[in-house]
Each structure stands twice: as structure tokens, then as C-alpha cells.
């Protein structure tokens, strides 16, 4: 119990060589402070290193290098084990020669011979070679010939483009331009109303006249926010409109950011009631896409040609319809 098998002589020699190399290498590594500056070794370290290398060279020259211990310093074993070379006796050599000669005599001779190739003529007539009569190699090769179809193919003339498709595309483009134009007008109208509200908050009710009409420009009296072309306040008016538009975009971006972070306005409300409202609206909507487009276009026309109160109601209806469509999809 607890006993280990005895080590062989080769293992003991390898371990002894490793211990010897560790002791010799320990003397070569400088220990402690090298010099006062710490840059150069002292003479004692140099002599110790030279003495150690002389001892290693002496062991290597005498052949007393232990087997396998050279891996410690990266040297090969100076006395490797030689591979024994096979030794042939004269009788075995003669017997092998006789066996090879007998094999050569008993082996059957080769019967396959290559027939001599005839020298081709230098010139060929058109009737001698079918490749010369055809225009290309693909026409004579059977793999590249077009086989006859098993099923007859009926070729139909290409269909001509109808004018209705082209006219429909032009009409859709004109409708898109018309809708974009009216939307731009309505957006400018909304921005002007917001600008007028902004001016009314910062100015008294009796002093709503433009402050730039007395600067010498030949323009008629007008209110602030409705400056005509040529008035110095025209640029300031559109600058205020641009600032209001940027503020609206900033508010929309903030709502989108809150939506991405999960703290939306709908999240603060009762989601069950909102989803029930959207589901009821989506159940009333037609399933045909053309009917939905016609409904939205009709609501857009009503919004563009109605008063402010009606526009508010139509806008709320459009938002509810779009939300219901989003919820349905």
C-alpha cells in the first residue's frame, strides 16, 4: 500500500541530468543587485558564467551528457543511439540474386503494343472532313444540337401595353402632387396660426402692427406675422415659422424616444380600453385596400376644404383610423 514502482536506469539518468543542469543554470542567472546603477554585471557574475559554460563543454566533450537532458538548454544529445544497419552474408546475397533472376525469367512478356501512328496528310479537302464544311464545332456536335420538342409550343405575340396603365400612373402622380401641394399650404397655415398666437402672447392687443413698416419701405400698413415681400420683417416671420417647425419636430422626436424606452403616453393610460377602442374601429373598417384608400382620401379632402373645428374632428378621425389599421396589422 502506497508503494510506487521502481524507476528504470534511463529515467534516473534523465532526472539526474535535469537536476545537474538546474544547479548549473542557477549559477549563471545573476541574483541580487548587479551594480549600483543596475546596468552592467560585476566581474564575479562574469567569472561564474564562464566557469559554468566550461563545465558544460567538458561534460559534452567527455560524452557524459545524460540522455534526454539536452532539452533544458536546447542542445542535442551528443551521443545519440545509432540505428543498427542490416548485415548480409554472402550466402544470403547470392540467394537473393538467384530469386530475382528466376522472377525475371518466369514473368510473362508484355503483349500490349502501341500501333504505329500514321502520318496525317498536310492538306485536307472539304469533302474529307465534315468539320471543314460546318461553320463551327457546336453545329456538328450531337450534344449541342437542338432536339425537337416533344410537346408543341404555341408562340403568342407579345402583349401591347395598354394606355390605361400609363394614364393611371400619370393620374396617380398628379394626385400625389396635388395632395402634397395642399398639405404644404395647410402646414404653412398651421404654422402661421401658431406664429400669430406667439405674437399675441408677447405683444399687447392694441399694438399688433408690424414694427418694420416705419423704416422707410414703401409698403402698406399690416400686422406682425403677415409681412409682404419687401418688408424687413418678412425674413423674421419665416425665421419664426422655421423655429416653430423645429420645435414641433423636437417634440415628435421626444415622443418617439419615449416610445422606444417603454414610457409612452399609451402606457400610462389604460391599455385595455385603448385596445378595445382600436379593435372596434378596425372591425368597422372595410377590408378592401381600395376602399381604405378612398376613405382616407375623402377625409383628406374634407380636412383641406373645411373650417378649423371641422378640421380638428377630421384630424382626430384620421388618427383613429390610422391607429386602428396599425393595430389590425
UniProtKB/Swiss-Prot annotation:
Its main location: virion. Residues 2-164, 259-291 are extracellular. Pfam families: vMSA. The record marks 239-240 as: Cleavage. It is found in: Virion membrane. Glycans are attached at residue 261. Disulfide bonds: none annotated. Residues 76-88 have a biased composition (Polar residues). Keywords: Fusion of virus membrane with host membrane, Glycoprotein, Host-virus interaction, Lipoprotein, Membrane, Myristate, Phosphoprotein, Transmembrane, Transmembrane helix, Viral attachment to host cell, Viral envelope protein, Viral penetration into host cytoplasm, Virion, Virus entry into host cell. Residues 2-237, 186-237, 313-329 are cytoplasmic. Residues 2-162 are annotated as: Pre-S. A lipid is attached at residue 2 (N-myristoyl glycine). InterPro entries: HBV_HBSAG. The large envelope protein is synthesized with the pre-S region at the cytosolic side of the endoplasmic reticulum and, hence will be within the virion after budding. Therefore the pre-S region is not N-glycosylated. Later a post-translational translocation of N-terminal pre-S and TM1 domains occur in about 50% of proteins at the virion surface. These molecules change their topology by an unknown mechanism, resulting in exposure of pre-S region at virion surface. The large envelope protein exists in two topological conformations, one which is termed 'external' or Le-HBsAg and the other 'internal' or Li-HBsAg. In its external conformation the protein attaches the virus to cell receptors and thereby initiating infection. This interaction determines the species specificity and liver tropism. The large envelope protein probably also assumes fusion between virion and host membranes. In its internal conformation the protein plays a role in virion morphogenesis and mediates the contact with the nucleocapsid like a matrix protein. Large internal envelope protein interacts with capsid protein. This is Large envelope protein. It comes from Duck hepatitis B virus (strain China).
